[in-house]
Amino acid sequence: LLLSDECPYTIKMAIYPDNTKKEFLDTKETSISSVLEQLEEAFRYIKLNNKVKAKIVGINRIEVPEYNEEVIRECLLNTIGHRNYEIPGSTLIHIFKDSIEFLSLGGLVSGLTIDDIKIGSSSSRNPKLISILHRLGYVEAYGSGIPRIMETYKLSKEKPEIIVAPNSFLIKIPKLDLDIDTLTIKNLLVTNNTITREDIERTLGIQKTSALKILNKMVEDGVLLKEDKGKSTTYKLNN
């Protein structure tokens, strides 16, 4: 039934102008179709409402969305992959001014805690569905979704919030509160263990003073570690 074109377990979404549910700007419910089609439909709707910040560096345009698209997809996969389909009702997604909430029916599988899933422990009430999602490439590794979401916010002051009740599971993701420069430096450190001031100057197209200001602020905030090596100073993520 879940993979048929007549799956009745829809996803209902609403957009709000602020951080309350007093009034909404728009609503949408996915069509009665397979959970995979509903996943893609919901993703497209959220993506349309995911604002993008942009910066021009030389001839390049750097774009940073308010919400990481991989995080959105992981949250959607979690809602359809682990919900309790014995409980009738729709998955709910609330798009607020500063956050998005994904609320699915069914609490944690017996024996698991929030701390367990944050470090990657996995147990599903829908093993066949998860297996299909894995074979189709939607799920890369069992139990990796929540840890990947948390890792994305490693440099952010605001962190995702998980609330579990006996019959529901909510994950709330905040807007990424990092500026474009900080996000660019973070992405640079994904492929490089260390960086130098000169790397930042070239990547961001800025002068020495501006590069040092950004790096020093990230060191003060505890995001980066500064390592003096004689004439060379390098920076790395503070794990």
Predicted ranges, named:
Residues 1-239:
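C-terminal regulatory or interaction extensions
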